[in-house]
Amino acid sequence: MAFLKKSLFLVLFLGIVSLSICEEEKREGEEEEKQEEENEELSEEELRDRRAWLDKLKSLGKVVGKVGLGVVQNYLNPRQ
């Protein structure tokens, strides 16, 4: 009877240990997935920021081009 109790205790102990190891690995996997999602979100935010900067630069380029064109036209065709 004592041998059976010890065997049962050993089986339960090993089962609990393996279960806790599996839970720990599962938590680590979930944390890694969460970090990857955050990195993807950051990448999307960075892309939006870059697009916004490109749009601003494009608008600035248009304004500078118009001003430059006006200066060149005034230089070539001065008003008297």
Curated annotation (Swiss-Prot):
Q: Which residues form the propeptide?
A: 23-49
Q: GO CC terms for this protein?
A: extracellular region
Instruction: Name one process (GO BP) from the record.
Output: defense response to bacterium
* Superkingdom to which the source organism belongs: Eukaryota
Question: What single Pfam family name could you report for this chain, choosing any that match?
Answer: FSAP_sig_propep
Q: In which tissues is it expressed?
A: Expressed by the skin glands.
Q: Cellular location of this protein?
A: Secreted
- UniProt entry keywords in alphabetical sequence: Amphibian defense peptide, Antibiotic, Antimicrobial, Cleavage on pair of basic residues, Secreted, Signal
* InterPro entries for this protein: Frog_antimicrobial_propeptide, FSAP
In the UniProt record, does the keyword Signal occur?
yes
The answer to keyword RNA-binding applying to this record is no
| Segment forming the signal sequence | 1-22
Q: What is its main location?
A: secreted
Q: What does this protein do?
A: Has antibacterial activity.
Q: Which family does it belong to?
A: Belongs to the frog skin active peptide (FSAP) family. Dermaseptin subfamily.
Protein's name according to its UniProt entry: Raniseptin-4
